[in-house]
C-alpha cells in the first residue's frame, strides 16, 4: 500500500482552478484571502464556522506546573491560547467512508 500524499495549498489551488475553469492566480488570491480572514477572525477571538465542514476556534490551555526533563526542576508553564479545528458532521461522515 502506497503512502498517502500530503495535499499542499498549491495542490488545492491547482485542483480548484481545474474544477472551476478559473485562472490559478485568481484561485490563489481567493484562497489566500480566505485564509487571511480566518486568521484575522481567530486573532480577534471569533469562531469561524463553515457549515458541514467544521469550526475553527481559539482554545485556552490553563497554566500548569511542569518538570524540566534534564534537571527534574519544577517549572511554571503559563496559560496559552491556541488555534483548534473541530470537524463538522458531514466531514466526519465523509472521512469514515
From Swiss-Prot:
Q: Which domain of life is it from?
A: Bacteria
Q: Which GO terms describe its biological process?
A: chromosome condensation
The Gene Ontology CC terms held by the record are:
cytosol
Sorted alphabetically, the keyword list is:
DNA condensation, DNA-binding
Is DNA-binding there in the keyword field? yes
Gene Ontology MF: a single term: DNA binding
Quaternary structure?
A: Has been isolated in complexes with 5S rRNA and bL25, and with 5S rRNA, bL25 and uL5. Homodimer.
Describe the task this protein carries out.
Histone-like DNA-binding protein which is capable of wrapping DNA to stabilize it, and thus to prevent its denaturation under extreme environmental conditions.
Report the sequence similarity comment from the record: Belongs to the bacterial histone-like protein family.
The name this protein carries in UniProt is: DNA-binding protein HU
Organism encoding this protein? Thermus thermophilus (strain ATCC 27634 / DSM 579 / HB8)
Recall the taxonomic lineage recorded for the source organism: Bacteria, Thermotogati, Deinococcota, Deinococci, Thermales
